């Protein structure tokens, strides 16, 4: 199924899984979307941080929290909260998602903006390469617009 690129508020998605980029240290990030996610799902972030501090979460992987609607997928694409998003980590996470989505019982995924606009130009071809051939329906948010539902998520 093709990838759909949308703009809007990922928190309003109808997809059962919301994926977003995060760091391997489990530290809070300061963007508007990250702050909204942290305020809405504090238990998910606390558990994720605990797993990071214990060394169970590595860059290039993802970790799922299924105790919310939508479920949350922390895509570990940065080593630290102030570090750059690494192409190799994005590639690894996308490859795993495209290959193993059935193991995680995923029927569709909405992916929140993974990084800033400048980094996204380099990452979009990588994301597209790994997800376009997958039968998993994917909606990728290119721009975060608070309070606005995307048309096809």
Please tell me what each predicted stretch does.
Residues 1-153:
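Macrodomain-like recognition of ADP-ribose-binding/processing modules
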């Amino acid at each position: 199924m093709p990838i759909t690129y949308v703009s809007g508020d990922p928190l309003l998605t109808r997809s059962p899984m919301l994926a977003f980029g995060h760091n391997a240290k489990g530290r809070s990030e300061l963007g508007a979307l990250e702050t909204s996610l942290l305020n809405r799902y504090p238990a998910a972030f606390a558990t994720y941080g605990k797993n990071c501090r214990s060394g169970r979460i590595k860059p290039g992987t993802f970790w799922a929290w299924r105790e919310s609607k939508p479920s949350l997928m922390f895509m570990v694409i940065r080593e630290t909260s102030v570090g750059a998003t690494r192409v190799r980590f994005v590639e690894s996470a996308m490859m795993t998602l495209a290959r193993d989505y059935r193991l995680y019982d995923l029927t569709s995924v909405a992916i929140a903006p993974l990084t800033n606009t400048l980094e996204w130009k380099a990452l979009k071809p990588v994301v597209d390469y790994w997800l376009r051939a997958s039968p998993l329906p994917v909606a990728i948010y290119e721009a975060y617009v608070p309070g606005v539902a995307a048309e096809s998520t």
